[in-house]
């Protein structure tokens, strides 16, 4: 299924090339910046029944914009960006359906299981999404944190996915090496996730056409979802029509209902 997104940088809805993100902004390559406020996109997604999407704050200076997005559709979108034990509950109260966390549960490149356990105790696993966004190195996928610039020691594989699935309701996984390039999805990663993930996962990165959405739906057996960013027409792209994604979800929902009916 198609999952929408609202990426925020400096208070604006943007699309960036994932591997270029930095706090200073000196090397960040921005492909698109919208004239619409974040709430405009939230209301659009709500109108079209697009559940499971997310709001991501890419760096500081986005709190007001994030609250604008979440407040426009309470309970309709997940939120990620600087989430920690102290503010997770506040973001849920601000309207997030779930909070997305990555960097805070890692210290010095290592997964901090106590921090993860504390967060689960605070908000509950059903309100927690783990971001396992990754980059490929030596033929394997490794979780990256700190604006996707720092490699951790955590490899994304079947054992890790099954282990961490006990602490969250869903995974969000950006293929950082292809994020924002509109040159096609990382099919190897999508195929692997379809085998490894015992819970739903949303993949993001590289989608360039509606065929990528069809591929992820087929390969992922309905458990792996796709976020399309830079290629989408509402984000200035030319590869994918937003209306086609909405129609794909409607058609897929209808087909699934028919196929599972007694």
For each predicted feature, which ranges?
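Catalytic cores of alpha/beta
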Residues: 64-99, 188-226, 237, 242
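Glycine-rich, proline-tolerant flexible connector loops at the mouths of alpha/beta enzymes
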Residues: 49-65, 103-109, 173-182
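Short, acidic/polar
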Residues: 32-45, 84-90, 153-162
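Structural preference for beta-strand elements that scaffold enzyme active sites
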Residues: 1-5, 51-54, 76-78, 97-100, ...
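C-terminal helical cap(s) of enzyme catalytic domains, especially alpha/beta-barrels
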Residues: 111-122, 213-262
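N-terminal beta-alpha supersecondary unit
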Residues: 18-62
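Conserved, mostly hydrophobic/aromatic
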Residues: 6-7, 45, 53, 91, ...
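Conserved anion-binding
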Residues: 9-24, 92-178
């Amino acid at each position: 299924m198609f999952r929408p997104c609202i990426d925020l940088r400096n208070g604006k809805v943007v699309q960036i090339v994932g591997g270029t993100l930095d706090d200073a902004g000196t090397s960040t390559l921005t492909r698109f910046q919208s004239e619409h406020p974040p709430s405009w996109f939230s209301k659009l997604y709500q109108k079209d029944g697009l559940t499971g999407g997310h709001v991501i704050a890419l760096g500081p200076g986005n709190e007001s914009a994030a609250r604008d997005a979440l407040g426009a559709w309470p309970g309709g979108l997940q939120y990620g960006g600087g989430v920690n034990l102290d503010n997770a509950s506040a973001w849920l109260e601000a309207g997030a359906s779930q909070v997305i966390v990555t960097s805070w549960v890692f210290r010095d490149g290592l997964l901090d299981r106590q921090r993860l356990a504390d967060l689960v105790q605070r908000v509950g696993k059903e309100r927690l999404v783990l971001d396992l966004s990754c980059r490929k190195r030596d033929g394997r996928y490794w979780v990256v944190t700190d604006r996707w610039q720092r490699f951790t020691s955590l490899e994304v594989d079947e054992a890790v996915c099954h282990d961490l699935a006990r602490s969250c309701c869903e995974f969000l996984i950006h293929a950082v090496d292809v994020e924002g390039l509109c040159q096609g999805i990382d099919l190897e990663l999508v195929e692997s996730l379809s085998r490894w993930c015992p819970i739903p996962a949303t993949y993001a990165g590289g989608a360039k056409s509606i065929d990528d959405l069809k591929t992820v739906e087929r390969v992922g057996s309905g458990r792996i979802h796709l976020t399309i960013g830079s290629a989408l027409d509402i984000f200035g792209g030319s590869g994918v029509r937003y209306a086609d994604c909405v129609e794909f979800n409607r058609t897929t929902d209808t087909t699934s209902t028919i196929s599972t009916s007694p």
